[in-house]
């Protein structure tokens, strides 16, 4: 029965892929039904605390480029700047330092809390959590509980790439397997830590891989309800090994990815982000008419996409984001990390 249902889904999606403009229309209708004409953004700061990493992901242009590691004082300074700017969120991630254990990640949270007790900390990918657990001789659940106790508010659902182990074996062979990623996400939800979800597409993946990935995300959400948004991430092909074989998605493909995600994830996941950093401002505006309802954050700095060739900048003032949304014919609203409206 399960295989029959999957066949029906694939046949329906094949029709959607063959009729993209109808797909765009359907996705936009579903977006309007779920969230209306509101388009959200978050005032946040990105902090990539190190580019040193023991992994060897073929799509990564960030790893070991400068071999830097921010001190806790440097992190505190960035937090102070974020608070002064009015940020409600800090997004904190980094490479995998060889000996990074739970205490290392706790020290980052403590540094943030030394500066500000209230700002929301959105930090540490599932890969970082598994890495901390391995280096500490602890379970993932134990690590997550300690991180939450120290102030972790939510987790980015990064390190997902494509949730298919045959693809992962080629593009990120040392990264956690699909089942491990799913288990970390479910465990986070179980202990009260919401997460985002991501998909990195446009390399050696096919639409079948993408669809299976989205259906897995949908299944997780049906079980836990802990996913706040989906963030589709087009592969950036500059300065990395994978870019020698794959040049990335087209703009049309990016829009179709947004639309298919909206349709497939309906109604479980309400929020789909169009990343202005990766897509560019104009394509992100277009995405607001094919299913997306969020433009992400101000960031203040962003190192990972920039190192892979992104040219859209790494900071956008809230007023610029609002104007971008208005020009696209939507209603801008500032949100927090968990999609509570702050306007």
UniProtKB/Swiss-Prot annotation:
CDD domains: Radical_SAM
EC number from the UniProt entry: 2.5.1.147
Family matches, as Gene3D superfamilies: Aldolase class I (3.20.20.70)
SUPFAM superfamilies registered for this protein in UniProt: Radical SAM enzymes (SSF102114)
Gene Ontology terms for molecular function: 4 iron, 4 sulfur cluster binding; 5-amino-6-(D-ribitylamino)uracil--L-tyrosine 4-hydroxyphenyl transferase activity; 7,8-didemethyl-8-hydroxy-5-deazariboflavin synthase activity; iron ion binding
UniProt-listed SMART domains: Elp3 (SM00729)
Biochemical pathway: Cofactor biosynthesis; coenzyme F0 biosynthesis
Ligand binding ([4Fe-4S] cluster): 53, 57, 60
Assigned keywords, A-Z: 4Fe-4S, Iron, Iron-sulfur, Metal-binding, S-adenosyl-L-methionine, Transferase
Residue ranges constituting the Radical SAM core domain according to the UniProt record: 39-268
Cofactor(s) needed by this chain: [4Fe-4S] cluster
Catalytic reaction equation(s): 5-amino-6-(D-ribitylamino)uracil + L-tyrosine + S-adenosyl-L-methionine = 5-amino-5-(4-hydroxybenzyl)-6-(D-ribitylimino)-5,6-dihydrouracil + 2-iminoacetate + 5'-deoxyadenosine + L-methionine + H(+)
UniProt family annotation: Belongs to the radical SAM superfamily. CofH family.
Description of how the protein assembles with itself and partners: Consists of two subunits, CofG and CofH.
Family matches, as NCBIfam families: CofH family radical SAM protein (TIGR00423), F420_cofH (TIGR03551), PRK07360.1 (NF005609)
Record PANTHER family: FO SYNTHASE (COFH) (PTHR43076), LIPOYL SYNTHASE 2 (PTHR43076:SF1)
Job description of the protein: Catalyzes the radical-mediated synthesis of 5-amino-5-(4-hydroxybenzyl)-6-(D-ribitylimino)-5,6-dihydrouracil from 5-amino-6-(D-ribitylamino)uracil and L-tyrosine.
Protein name listed in UniProt: 5-amino-6-(D-ribitylamino)uracil--L-tyrosine 4-hydroxyphenyl transferase
Natural source organism: Archaeoglobus fulgidus (strain ATCC 49558 / DSM 4304 / JCM 9628 / NBRC 100126 / VC-16)
The gene coding this protein: cofH
């Amino acid at each position: 029965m399960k295989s029959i249902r999957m066949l029906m889904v694939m046949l329906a999606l094949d029709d959607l892929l063959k009729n993209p403009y109808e797909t765009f229309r359907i996705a936009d209708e579903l977006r309007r039904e779920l969230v209306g004409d509101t388009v959200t953004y978050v005032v946040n700061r990105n902090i990539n605390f190190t580019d040193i990493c023991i992994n060897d992901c073929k799509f990564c242009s960030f790893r070991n480029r400068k071999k830097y590691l921010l001190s806790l004082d440097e992190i505190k300074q960035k937090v102070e700047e974020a608070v002064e700017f009015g940020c409600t969120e800090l997004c904190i991630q980094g490479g995998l330092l060889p000996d990074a254990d739970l205490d290392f990640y706790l020290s980052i949270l403590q540094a943030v809390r030394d500066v500000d007790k209230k700002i929301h900390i959105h930090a540490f990918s599932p890969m970082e959590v598994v890495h901390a657990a391995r280096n500490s001789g602890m379970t993932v659940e134990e690590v997550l509980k300690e991180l939450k106790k120290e102030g972790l508010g939510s987790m980015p659902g990064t390190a997902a790439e494509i949730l298919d182990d045959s693809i992962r074996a080629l593009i990120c062979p040392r990264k956690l397997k699909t089942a491990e990623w799913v288990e970390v996400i479910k465990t986070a939800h179980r202990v009260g830590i919401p997460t985002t979800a991501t998909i990195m597409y446009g390399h050696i993946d096919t639409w079948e891989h993408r669809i299976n990935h989205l259906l897995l995300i949908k299944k997780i959400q049906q079980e836990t309800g802990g996913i706040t948004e989906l963030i589709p991430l087009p592969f950036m092909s500059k300065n990395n090994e994978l870019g020698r074989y794959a040049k990335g998605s087209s703009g049309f493909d990016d829009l179709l990815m947004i639309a298919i995600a909206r349709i497939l994830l309906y109604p479980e996941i309400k929020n789909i982000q169009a990343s202005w950093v990766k897509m560019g401002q104009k394509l992100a505006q277009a995405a607001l008419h094919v299913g997306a309802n969020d433009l992400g954050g101000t960031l203040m700095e962003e190192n990972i996409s920039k190192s892979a060739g992104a040219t859209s900048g790494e900071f956008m003032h809230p007023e610029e984001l609002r104007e971008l949304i208005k020009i696209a014919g939507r209603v801008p609203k500032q949100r927090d990390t968990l999609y509570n409206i702050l306007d």
